[in-house]
UniProtKB/Swiss-Prot annotation:
UniProt function note: Forms part of the ribosomal stalk which helps the ribosome interact with GTP-bound translation factors. Is thus essential for accurate translation.
Annotated Gene Ontology cellular component terms: cytosolic large ribosomal subunit
InterPro entries documented for this protein: Ribosomal_bL12, Ribosomal_bL12_C, Ribosomal_bL12_C/ClpS-like, Ribosomal_bL12_oligo, Ribosomal_bL12_oligo_N_sf
Similarity remark: Belongs to the bacterial ribosomal protein bL12 family.
CDD domains documented for this protein: Ribosomal_L7_L12
GO BP: any one term: translation
Keywords annotated in UniProt: Ribonucleoprotein, Ribosomal protein
Keyword Oxidoreductase among record annotations: no
A single MF term (Gene Ontology): mRNA binding
Membrane-crossing residue ranges in chain numbering: none
Subunit structure: Homodimer. Part of the ribosomal stalk of the 50S ribosomal subunit. Forms a multimeric L10(L12)X complex, where L10 forms an elongated spine to which 2 to 4 L12 dimers bind in a sequential fashion. Binds GTP-bound translation factors.
Provenance organism: Ligilactobacillus salivarius (strain UCC118) (Lactobacillus salivarius)
Protein name, as recorded: Large ribosomal subunit protein bL12
């Protein structure tokens, strides 16, 4: 069975939003996957978009006055070498870890703030 990509795309262009929504749900059920990225993008436009978010990026916004401690914490969190960890800290704002669960993101934020860094979760 060969797929005709152009025919599939043409059929998708002609489908209504409701039909496309049903298709996405059927694909999610059939293959056990989630279209969470598209939901997160759509939800971000609404006021409750942050409440539905399930993965976060931990961003170092400022190293503060205890830069050496922050570099060590970044090194421990990321598993990077000392030079690379220093580069992340010196290049703030920089993302320390991407796509982590909310509880892990809050734990990492607490560790970094404990040594004097300023951190945001995105």
């Amino acid at each position: 069975m060969a797929l005709d990509t152009e025919k599939i795309i043409a059929d998708l262009k002609e489908a209504s939003i409701l039909e496309l929504n049903d298709l996405v749900k059927a694909i999610e059920e059939e293959f056990g996957v989630s279209a969470a990225a598209s939901v997160a993008v759509a939800g971000a436009a609404g006021a409750d978009g942050a409440a539905e978010k399930d993965s976060f990026d931990v961003e170092l916004t400022d190293a503060g006055s205890a830069k050496v401690k922050v570099i060590k914490a970044v090194k421990d969190i990321t598993g990077l070498g000392l030079k690379d960890a220093k580069g992340l800290v010196d290049g703030a704002p920089s993302v320390i870890k991407e796509g982590v669960a909310k509880d892990e993101a809050e734990e990492l934020k607490a560790k970094l703030e404990e040594v004097g860094a300023k951190v945001t979760l995105k």
